[in-house]
Design a protein with these regions (language model features):
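Conserved hydrophobic "DFG−1" position in protein kinase catalytic cores
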Residues: 16-19, 65, 74-75, 119-120
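Conserved structural core of kinase catalytic domains
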Residues: 30, 40-45, 49-98
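A short acidic, helix-capping loop that chelates divalent metal ions and anchors anionic groups
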Residues: 33-37, 82, 137-139
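Hydrophobic core positions within the conserved protein kinase catalytic domain
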Residues: 51, 99-103, 116
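C-lobe/activation-segment region of protein kinase-like
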Residues: 122-214
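ATP-binding glycine-rich loop module of kinase domains
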Residues: 2-52
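Catalytic-loop of the protein kinase fold
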Residues: 104-121
Length: 214
């Protein structure tokens, strides 16, 4: 068995563990900063709950174990979207289908603005990772629909970056209509969020686990 550290930050350590039976990723909150342990455990619980709800879905990690401190999930081979732009139009078609499946299951990801959370697999298909901020809803409340809408807008922003000519008229209208929550986020929450992630945690804007090593 071999272990590779993918990320170390005040919220814990993320490792890639390779065994004779395959590989898995574990997020270990036991190494979190003493003042942030509660937050690290809460985020780990969110990820575990979301992955449990998505059991059996293709294109997302499979939850292997969670003991309240360490989350283990299957490893999905692939490259972040910003490293390996998709070669075919089918990628964003696949991405939209995957996102709809998440939402039908009652899971909103809430962190899809980061290209590092979108993978391009070896088959040029879409996969989504990092469900720490995900939320679940048994009923499609207005809040859930708003979060799902923002997930969709983030996907379409990436499509606009890499395949702008493939956007439909309806998708362009979605891009032109941010929710009030998005406008409030940009005005009030985004500046302190960027300070925490870039200054306190030292994450580059597009950082994925490999770039966040301490």
């Amino acid at each position: 068995m071999t272990t590779e550290i993918l990320k170390v930050d005040p919220l814990g350590t993320t490792r890639l563990v390779s065994t004779g039976d395959g590989a898995f990723v574990e997020r270990d909150t036991r190494t979190a900063h003493a003042t942030l342990g509660w937050l690290a455990r809460r985020l780990a619980a969110r990820e575990a709950a979301a992955l449990a709800a998505l059991a059996g879905e293709a294109g997302v990690p499979r939850l292997l174990a969670f003991d309240g401190l360490v989350v283990r999930r299957s490893f999905l081979p692939g490259k972040p979207l910003y490293e390996t732009p998709p070669r075919s139009r089918a990628y964003f078609v696949d991405a939209l289908r995957l996102l709809r499946r998440l939402h039908r299951t009652g899971v909103a990801h809430n962190d899809l603005a980061k290209e590092a959370n979108w993978l391009v697999t070896n088959e040029d298909a879409c996969a989504i990772i990092d469900f720490q901020l995900a939320t679940r809803a048994r009923v499609r409340t207005a809040k859930f629909r708003r979060r799902a809408y923002e997930d969709l807008r983030h996907l379409l922003k990436h499509k606009r970056t890499y395949q702008p000519n493939c956007l439909t008229a309806r998708q362009l209208r979605v891009l032109a209509r941010p929710t009030w929550a998005t406008r409030a986020w940009r005005a009030l929450a985004k500046p302190p969020y960027r300070f925490v992630t870039r200054v306190v945690l030292g994450w580059p804007e597009r950082a994925g686990p490999l770039e966040r090593r301490g």
